């Protein structure tokens, strides 16, 4: 059995900052995540990709951001329960008890759920499934592995354009294909790629891949036109992910689709259960890493008052510490 003041469910950026902030408030904290390493989707999907919208960093690699967050929390010795899924939520004497995979229990004063979008599965590129692992990938753990290759990126969101700008200096060629004329990606991200020697093909789909054991080419068909065969070594299918809340969906939390509804204190409908980061929903919600950091601090501060009603909601600035 484990016992802490705050149990953080999810070791992505918001969860790691929640761990720091709990320590800053003098609270003991445990971080639970089903993945074997901290960092959530950043570590799992794009550790080498540059992130441009974190305050104070013009650009920072995903793995470096995660390393900095872990280092920031380290002085407070958070307990990491990685490779461990939080399966159940119950209460004992009014306090939350998390049932962990494997049968262990984590007793705590409050829970802060920072599980991102839950567990995630890449949306498949139908014509490419037989090449998974031999030329079709859904994220790029090591961009250097694609040095000198002809790379085809499929998708129109931020991930597709981020991979295009990351891989362009390394690859022999980069082609980005999107089935629509308009993109979901941020306008600045699109403009950055258009300024690079990246071929962008719109209103088009990948209709066939060529190759024996590995991909050697791809047929691209523009709407109303003929197919064009491109030489391709690697296809990056950046088509987004389907999310699954997993056991969280059975905890009795109020949901808005796959998100947890919270109030201005980041409290959910369950006693002593708060949430922060991409998993939350409220009017005007914007899903950014930067937003998640503020929500994590709000959740922890309000949880601290629940644990000790005599405590101040605002503990002071970290710069006041000597």
Swiss-Prot record:
<feature type="binding site">
    <location>
        <position position="46"/>
    </location>
    <ligand>
        <name>FAD</name>
    </ligand>
</feature>
<keyword id="KW-0274">FAD</keyword>
<feature type="binding site">
    <location>
        <position position="319"/>
    </location>
    <ligand>
        <name>FAD</name>
    </ligand>
</feature>
<keyword id="KW-0521">NADP</keyword>
<dbReference type="InterPro" id="IPR036188">
    <property type="entry name" value="FAD/NAD-bd_sf"/>
</dbReference>
<comment type="subunit">
    <text>Homodimer.</text>
</comment>
<feature type="binding site">
    <location>
        <position position="278"/>
    </location>
    <ligand>
        <name>FAD</name>
    </ligand>
</feature>
<feature type="binding site">
    <location>
        <position position="86"/>
    </location>
    <ligand>
        <name>FAD</name>
    </ligand>
</feature>
<keyword id="KW-0560">Oxidoreductase</keyword>
<feature type="binding site">
    <location>
        <position position="41"/>
    </location>
    <ligand>
        <name>FAD</name>
    </ligand>
</feature>
<dbReference type="InterPro" id="IPR050097">
    <property type="entry name" value="Ferredoxin-NADP_redctase_2"/>
</dbReference>
<protein>
    <recommendedName>
        <fullName>Ferredoxin--NADP reductase</fullName>
        <ecNumber>1.18.1.2</ecNumber>
    </recommendedName>
</protein>
<feature type="binding site">
    <location>
        <position position="120"/>
    </location>
    <ligand>
        <name>FAD</name>
    </ligand>
</feature>
<dbReference type="InterPro" id="IPR023753">
    <property type="entry name" value="FAD/NAD-binding_dom"/>
</dbReference>
<dbReference type="Pfam" id="PF07992">
    <property type="entry name" value="Pyr_redox_2"/>
</dbReference>
<dbReference type="GO" id="GO:0050661">
    <property type="term" value="F:NADP binding"/>
</dbReference>
<dbReference type="GO" id="GO:0004324">
    <property type="term" value="F:ferredoxin-NADP+ reductase activity"/>
</dbReference>
<keyword id="KW-0285">Flavoprotein</keyword>
<feature type="binding site">
    <location>
        <position position="33"/>
    </location>
    <ligand>
        <name>FAD</name>
    </ligand>
</feature>
<dbReference type="InterPro" id="IPR022890">
    <property type="entry name" value="Fd--NADP_Rdtase_type_2"/>
</dbReference>
<comment type="similarity">
    <text>Belongs to the ferredoxin--NADP reductase type 2 family.</text>
</comment>
<dbReference type="GO" id="GO:0050660">
    <property type="term" value="F:flavin adenine dinucleotide binding"/>
</dbReference>
């Amino acid at each position: 059995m484990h016992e802490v003041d705050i149990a953080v469910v999810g070791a992505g950026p918001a969860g790691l900052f929640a761990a720091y902030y709990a320590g800053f408030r003098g609270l003991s904290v445990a971080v639970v995540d089903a993945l074997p390493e901290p960092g959530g989707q950043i570590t799992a999907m794009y550790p080498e990709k540059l992130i441009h919208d974190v305050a104070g960093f013009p650009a920072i690699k995903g793995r470096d951001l995660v390393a900095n967050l872990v280092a920031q929390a380290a002085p407070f010795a958070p307990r990491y329960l990685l490779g461990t899924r939080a399966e159940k939520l119950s209460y004992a004497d009014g306090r939350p008890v998390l049932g962990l995979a494997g049968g262990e229990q984590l007793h705590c004063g409050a829970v802060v759920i920072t599980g991102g979008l839950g567990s995630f599965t890449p949306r498949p590129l139908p014509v490419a499934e037989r090449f998974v692992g031999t030329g079709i990938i859904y994220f790029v753990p090591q961009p250097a592995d694609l040095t000198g290759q002809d790379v085809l990126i499929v998708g129109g969101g931020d991930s597709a354009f981020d991979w295009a700008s990351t891989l362009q200096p390394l690859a022999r060629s980069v082609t980005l294909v999107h089935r629509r004329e308009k993109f979901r990606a941020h306008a600045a991200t699109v403009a950055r790629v258009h300024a690079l020697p990246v071929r962008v093909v719109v209103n088009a789909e990948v209709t066939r891949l060529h190759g024996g054991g590995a991909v050697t080419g791809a047929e691209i068909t523009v709407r109303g036109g003929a197919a064009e065969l491109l030489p391709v070594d690697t296809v990056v299918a950046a088509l987004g992910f389907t999310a699954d809340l997993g056991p969280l969906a059975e905890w009795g939390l109020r949901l808005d689709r796959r998100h947890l509804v919270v109030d201005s204190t980041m409290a959910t409908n369950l006693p002593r259960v708060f949430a922060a980061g991409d998993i939350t929903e409220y009017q005007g919600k914007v899903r950014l890493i930067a937003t998640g950091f503020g929500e994590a601090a709000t959740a922890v501060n309000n949880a601290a008052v629940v644990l000790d009603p005599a405590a101040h909601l605002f503990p002071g600035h970290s710069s006041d510490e000597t």
